[in-house]
Amino acid sequence: MHLNRTTMTRLQWTLTLALAGIATSVALTSSSSGVAQVQNANRTGELGSGTTCNLCHGGGSFGTSVDIVVLDPNSGQAITQYLPGEQYVLEVAVQTSQGTPPRYGMQATAVLDASSTNAGTFSEPSANTQLEDVGGRHIFEHNAASASNAFSVNWTAPLEGGDVTFYAAGLAAGNPTSAGGDEYAGATLTLPEVEVVIEIGGCTYDFACNYNAQAAFDDGSCEITSCAVEGDLDGDGNVN
């Protein structure tokens, strides 16, 4: 069979487009193992992430939202501020209000607001998650299309630095084998650093020899006689 040049060109374009489609499909499907792990990409929504999961995922309609909570591991209660150097549990949940998608995915990070650097460290991720680094940014993400919508990891707060913002991207995956039928949502949570106030004890009796106007409480150290004036009966420094 003889093919003219026009027919051959069309065949070449068809083959090129088909191969590109296969490559794209493979790339998107393989990201179910985590976009940081597969593509070295940050999709958390923080300033350095560039773009979101909407770049590849869409078409779904689940009323998707993302919840971020940081828990005290001892009480199990959500915290509203953190103590430097303490360990907490970061939980990310992908919620839906319309239907139940078969799979879920997520990616999250923690950033110091003042410096845009990593805020603390992650450790001991839950069974459906993994830890990655993208361009130096610590990433916590799903390790496979997850049947559970809940993801968790231990977070150790930075030793200092002020406010910390957690960024999380979540996916409700309508079709676990492709990027179609998915819906993305993002969320942030900002926690301030606990302001530690050190109270100074001292003598709060203003007639004492060692009176300390800066003392927050009396520590029983007041000394009256060492500076007493002869004839001063009430310790006010004057002869009565």
Where does each model-flagged region fall?
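Short amphipathic alpha-helical segments with coiled-coil-like heptad repeat character
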Residues: 2, 161-169, 214-223
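Primarily marks secretory-pathway-exposed extracellular/lumenal segments that are disulfide-
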Residues: 198-240
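Polar/charged alpha-helical tracts
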Residues: 5-6, 10, 73-77, 229, ...
